[in-house]
């Protein structure tokens, strides 16, 4: 069955990658289908839904359950060619007639509950984001009007597989427990969407900021988080993972009024920042050996040292070479100076930025000029938050 997305795709790496649709679209379509059956009195196999992006979806209704004054049905999530943990799950909507006027919406099993401030929903509410909520209520209202129904309706969105899937998402870090969030701003999933990941980072940053954290502690990935926990006297539970998006993280911090960011980063990622590379994914750029070799020369290393570094495969191997030439300290000073320069360049010095850099084999390699100020501010901030 055609779903309306057959002509929508992007080309990445010479491959045609299909669009998909969000959990928000699934919830709205399931809700529309359940309402149609409940009020229209006729069984139907498909439902159409216009997404905010302007793409009309035609989706198959699954697991239809009809009771007195209540109908439940589901839509199977199709994320297209996006690597999405929710791909293939069933998103259910139960719509029930009520004596009270108006439409109520809540989450059932597998839809997370908000336990911390700073999100779009209040504490205790279901993690159904604003656009999906609007889509669900609009679809239900329009269907009720179609059948001249003036009574009340109660909607429950549930995702049975969401309890386990939610544990693998950002939700536990955001204080959303018990399941996944019902997401989507356009209703459509674009393959390998960087925008979606950057948006999830923004949400986490905003939440930390709303809780009084004006100085943020950021780690690009698991290595940074592990080093922070095991080797630094800083509040590990406050760390935010920015993945490869160093530049975007700085931009978003400035936009929301953050005063500073301290990055705790592995040399393999952050050495790229010393060349002004603000997206550290290898698909975007990889100048690790060139950066280390040029800064080794700047620090006074012999040409042979630089040549060996250029032939190295990993930063750990390059560090072994620098150690052998006794050039690690001098080279890292140059690298850290360049990192500080490019961090400030990205922010136009609007906020305080710094980094602590390490490797898995050598441990602590150094920190940028403003890192000490940031460490002090984060610890002061943490004590103030504890005292509240």
Feature locations, PLM:
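Flexible, glycine-rich phosphate/dinucleotide-binding loops
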Residues: 164, 225, 364
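Generic N-terminal targeting/processing segments that precede catalytic cores or assembly contacts
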Residues: 2-168, 172-174
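Intrinsic structural disorder
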Residues: 1, 93, 191, 387-388
């Amino acid at each position: 069955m055609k779903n309306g997305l057959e002509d929508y795709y992007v080309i990445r790496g010479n491959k045609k990658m299909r669009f998909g649709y969000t959990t928000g679209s699934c919830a709205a379509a399931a809700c529309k289908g359940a309402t149609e059956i409940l009020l229209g009195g006729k069984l139907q196999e498909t439902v159409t839904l216009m997404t905010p992006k302007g793409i009309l979806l035609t989706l198959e209704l699954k697991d239809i359950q009809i009771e007195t004054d209540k109908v439940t049905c589901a839509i199977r999530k199709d994320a297209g060619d996006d690597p999405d943990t929710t791909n293939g799950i069933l998103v259910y909507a139960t719509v029930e007639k009520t004596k009270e006027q108006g439409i109520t919406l809540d989450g059932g099993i597998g839809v997370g509950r908000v336990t911390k401030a700073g999100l779009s929903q209040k504490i205790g509410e279901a993690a159904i984001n604003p656009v999906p909520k609007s889509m669900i209520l609009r679809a239900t209202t329009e269907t009720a009007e179609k059948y001249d129904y003036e009574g009340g309706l109660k909607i429950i969105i549930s995702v049975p597989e969401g309890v386990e899937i939610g544990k693998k998402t950002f939700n536990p870090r955001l204080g959303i427990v018990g399941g996944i969030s019902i997401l989507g701003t356009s209703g459509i999933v674009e393959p390998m969407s960087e925008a979606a990941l950057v948006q999830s980072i923004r949400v986490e940053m905003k939440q930390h900021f709303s809780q009084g954290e004006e100085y943020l502690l950021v780690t690009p990935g698991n290595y940074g988080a592990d080093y922070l926990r095991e080797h630094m006297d800083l509040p590990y539970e406050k760390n935010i993972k920015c993945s490869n998006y160093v530049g975007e993280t700085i931009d978003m911090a400035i936009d929301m009024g953050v005063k500073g960011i301290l990055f705790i980063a592995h040399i393999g990622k952050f050495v790229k920042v010393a060349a002004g590379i603000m997206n550290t994914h290898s698909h975007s750029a990889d100048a690790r050996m060139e950066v280390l070799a040029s800064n080794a020369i700047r620090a006074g290393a012999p040409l042979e040292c630089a040549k060996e570094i250029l032939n190295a495969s990993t930063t750990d191997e390059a560090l072994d070479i620098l150690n052998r030439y006794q050039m690690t300290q001098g080279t890292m000073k140059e690298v850290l100076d360049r990192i500080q320069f490019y961090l400030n360049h990205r922010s136009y010095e609007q906020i305080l930025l710094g980094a602590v850099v390490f490797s898995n084999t050598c441990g602590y390699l150094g920190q940028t000029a403003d890192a000490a100020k940031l460490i002090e501010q984060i610890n002061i901030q943490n004590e103030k938050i504890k005292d509240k």
